[in-house]
């Protein structure tokens, strides 16, 4: 890949190394959840993570990746965020004429070895991105960006909108979450149920982007299909009696079970009748069939 010319507002990740791309795409949502849980300020946290990803792109490509990539990202993103929060605090003090405040523990960077995934806050982040203050289109775009780790270009292609329009939509969505005073807490059962339809749509789009990638050299991006399946399983654990959730998880498992056999050595699609069925994932198929059977029995 080559590096395109970048606008200052375009903070998506462009990487030369495919393995590093997969690593950063997997780590970014985890780092974001840590920052939002610790500091709040979802919009500022998301910007800080994107800046850390750009820093990783430049530094890792030159010097190689650090021993603990997630801790590196967390440290860099935390420092960027803290700098921004301090600047905002200083600006408010100047405007209000208030005496300088003592820094509190929230404005101190966490240690580099702080666990990124002590708690799996993915679902909390997912439902936050589907906040009712946002339009359905904004909910989809923001979740694909923050939780799915897709770039602006990939999301724009998935939603069939111009990239510039999509970037503005994401920016407005983050501002609306801030204006609504949304907190990084799990929604109550009724709120959760109201947002579930959008959540499932988002998870399906993430899976679909991974199963038939719209960009890059690979037809299949297993890190995206695996992440979509993982999060959908978390949602299923949360609402095990919901037939739509079970059906979506079954669809993902049964579809992705054939991934190793659907492309030949030349990268061309292999029709199902010609696929080597010994390469299908029998465990995933069994799990998918069991989900369907349980859903039909209820």
Residues of each region from the PLM?
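Structural recognition of an alpha-helix C-terminal capping motif at a helix-to-coil junction
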Residues: 47-54, 67-79
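Amphipathic helix-loop-helix modules that constitute alpha-helical solenoid scaffolds
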Residues: 88, 95-137, 143-154, 161-298
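The DNA-contacting recognition helix of HTH DNA-binding domains
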Residues: 28, 42, 46, 70, ...
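Short, small-residue-biased leader/transition segments that mark boundaries at the very start
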Residues: 1-8
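The N-cap/first-turn positions of alpha helices
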Residues: 28, 137-138
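A short, charge-rich alpha-helical start-of-domain segment used by transcription regulators
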Residues: 12-33, 37, 43, 193-201, ...
């Amino acid at each position: 890949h080559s590096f395109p010319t970048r606008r200052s507002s375009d903070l998506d990740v462009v990487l030369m190394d495919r393995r590093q791309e997969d690593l950063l795409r997997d780590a970014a949502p985890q780092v974001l959840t840590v920052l939002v849980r610790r500091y709040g300020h979802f919009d500022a946290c998301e910007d800080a993570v994107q800046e850390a990803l750009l820093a990783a792109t430049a530094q890792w490509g030159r010097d190689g990746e650090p021993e603990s990539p997630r801790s590196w990202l967390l440290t860099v993103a935390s420092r960027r965020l803290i700098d921004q929060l301090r600047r905002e605090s200083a600006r408010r003090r100047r405007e209000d004429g208030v005496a300088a405040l003592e820094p509190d523990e929230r404005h101190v960077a966490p240690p580099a070895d702080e666990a990124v995934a002590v708690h799996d806050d993915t679902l909390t982040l997912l439902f936050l991105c589907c906040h009712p203050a946002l339009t359905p289109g904004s909910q989809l775009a923001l979740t694909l960006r923050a939780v799915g780790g897709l770039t602006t270009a990939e999301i724009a292609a998935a939603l069939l909108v111009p990239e510039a329009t999509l970037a503005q939509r994401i920016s407005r969505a983050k501002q609306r979450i801030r204006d609504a005073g949304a907190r990084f807490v799990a929604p109550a059962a009724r709120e959760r149920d109201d947002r579930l339809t959008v959540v499932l749509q988002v998870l399906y789009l993430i899976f679909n982007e991974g199963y038939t990638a719209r960009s890059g050299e690979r037809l299949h991006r297993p890190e995206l299909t695996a992440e979509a399946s993982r999060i959908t399983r978390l949602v299923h654990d949360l609402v095990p009696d919901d037939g739509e959730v079970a059906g979506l998880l079954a669809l993902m498992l049964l579809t992705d079970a054939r991934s190793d056999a659907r492309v030949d050595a030349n990268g061309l699609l292999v029709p199902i009748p010609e696929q080597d069925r010994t390469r299908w994932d029998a465990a995933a198929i069994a799990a998918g069939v069991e989900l369907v059977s349980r859903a039909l029995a209820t």
